């Protein structure tokens, strides 16, 4: 299965092309330039280099959030359009899951953290079950200190590891918290290849959507009140 993976949820946006589990090409830039101006330019470059055309993809995988409203809107709108025109399915993938999926840590609980800017973070918790990661509760946006204060109740004494592309953002606060013994693992901010692989896994489980059903996973500040319910 040939996959085009798109991530516009963070400043380190990326595109990747996969043939089954094999990554054929990746484009990523971390620049102060809007996604609306660079996404299609980078896509054109990647497809030209690989000599592939949009109709030749079997699946589009896209980061559906959490992330900036503007960035997510650009990526999701593009994927919606391609899927509708070419009649292809979509895998909507969590960016936090893509971060957690890169971890080499052996702890049963993984806590991915992404910079949400303005003094806040996006955070969540994933549990290893049967060779895959399953989300434990809701993904949230709040200050790091608030997030760390809420973790003990959900972790319930289980070992956990923090996973993030920006360790400098959380390392000091973790060291001052009751989780000071927990590892902080650094992973890549380039998420498109991982999003592609997670999208393939979702396709195998039949967890796909069409262009009409695709929606962004925006997290509002008030969602903090719903932390890990459900």
Give the role of each language-model region.
Residues 1-66, 189:
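N-terminal beta-alpha supersecondary unit
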Residues 22, 34, 89-190, 218, ...:
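Surface "functional belts" at beta-alpha junctions
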Residues 46-50, 85, 103, 195-203:
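Stable alpha-helical structural segments in soluble proteins, enriched in small hydrophobic residues
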Residues 185-216:
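Glycine-rich phosphate-binding/hydrolytic loop that grips phosphoryl groups
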Residues 61-92:
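DPxDG-like acidic metal-binding loop motif
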Residues 36, 40-43, 79, 96, ...:
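A general structural signal for well-ordered alpha-helical segments in protein cores
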Residues 20-23, 76-86, 128-131:
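A glycine- and small-aliphatic-rich helix-loop capping segment at beta-alpha/alpha-beta transitions
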């Amino acid at each position: 299965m040939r996959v085009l993976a798109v991530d516009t949820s963070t400043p380190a946006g990326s595109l990747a092309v996969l043939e089954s589990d094999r990554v054929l090409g990746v484009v990523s830039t971390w620049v102060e330039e809007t996604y609306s101006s660079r996404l299609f330019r980078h896509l054109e470059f990647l497809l030209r280099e690989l000599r592939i055309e949009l109709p030749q993809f079997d699946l589009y995988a896209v980061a559906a959030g959490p992330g900036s409203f503007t960035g997510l809107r650009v990526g999701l709108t593009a994927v919606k359009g391609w899927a509708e025109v070419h009649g292809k399915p979509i895998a909507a993938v969590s960016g936090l899951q893509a971060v957690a999926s890169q971890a080499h840590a052996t702890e049963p609980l993984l806590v991915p953290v992404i910079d949400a800017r303005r003094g806040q973070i996006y955070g969540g918790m994933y549990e290893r079950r049967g060779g895959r990661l399953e989300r434990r509760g809701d993904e949230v946006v709040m200050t790091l200190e608030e997030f760390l204060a809420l973790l003990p109740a959900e972790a319930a004494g289980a070992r956990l590891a923090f996973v993030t592309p920006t360790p400098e953002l959380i390392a000091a606060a973790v060291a001052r918290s009751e989780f000071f013994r927990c590892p902080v693992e650094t992973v890549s901010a380039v998420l498109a290849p991982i999003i592609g692989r997670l999208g393939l896994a979702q396709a195998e489980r039949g967890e796909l959507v069409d262009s009409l059903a695709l929606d962004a996973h925006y997290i509002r500040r008030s969602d903090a009140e719903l932390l890990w319910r459900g």
